[in-house]
Regions:
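Active-site microenvironment for binding and transforming phosphate-containing groups
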Residues: 1-223
Length: 223
């Protein structure tokens, strides 16, 4: 199996997600050529102008052609952003902690869009509402952070026979983008826990591989 998604985007950029049996090499990149942060479930956002592995960062932004900004996931939600007017791109790692901390909004603000209508978002494969069972403390964290719980949370029967909360991380991040006036939001919709095409920490343990999610501004010669 060689799972690679290349998203439908303007001709001046490439946005992608790699799954099992694939990698950034399929797109002509080497790992050492990426702007790829060492993620810690933070809300830290960093502008990058060259390849590297910055510490304790979960979102990266660039305006440099030829520099892929990437995040790794294995159930968490990847959000890829691009500004069509300024030609700025970003990759965001949004697990539940990052989502509660509104990391996608902090990333958008650091991109300094002239108009939110210029911003476009791709929400890639991640764990679905049906599969993302959480404890009451996670539900309370989203509630305290001002999320619309009637929209993003549901109760489903759990394996112990009781009901448990489930959170829709895709829609939680869509809500955050909509709050800032971003309208063009594409949700890819594949659940990593149920799809064998992608790595899943909940299905395969935390030591499984990782899906790479990236976006790159093409060099002028490639457009």
């Amino acid at each position: 199996m060689n799972k690679l998604i290349v998203y439908n985007t303007p001709s001046w950029l490439t946005a992608f997600t790699t799954g099992k049996g694939s990698g950034v090499e399929a797109l002509g990149f080497q790992l050492e050529e990426l702007a790829l942060p060492r993620q810690v479930h933070s809300d830290n956002v960093l502008w990058m102008h060259e390849a590297g592995r910055p510490e304790a960062t979960d979102a990266v932004i660039t305006d440099q052609p030829g520099l892929p900004v990437c995040v790794k996931t294995a159930d968490c939600i990847p959000v890829l952003l691009y500004d069509t007017r300024q030609r700025i791109v970003a990759a965001v790692h949004a697990g539940w902690r990052g989502t509660v901390s509104r990391i996608v909004q902090k990333t958008v603000r650091q991109m300094h869009p002239l108009d939110p209508k210029d911003l476009h978002a791709i929400i890639g494969p991640g764990i679905s509402l049906q599969q993302f069972e959480v404890g009451d403390e996670v539900y309370e964290a989203f509630f305290a952070a001002g999320f619309p719980m009637e929209r993003i949370a549901r109760r489903f029967p759990s394996s112990n026979g009781k009901e448990a909360w489930h959170i829709d991380l895709w829609d939680a991040n869509r809500f955050l983008l909509q709050e800032l006036g971003v309208d063009d939001i594409f949700v890819e919709g594949t659940c990593t826990r149920t799809s064998g095409d992608f790595y899943s920490a909940r299905r395969e343990t935390i030591n499984t591989g990782r899906n790479y999610n990236g976006i790159v501004i093409k060099m002028k010669s490639e457009e």
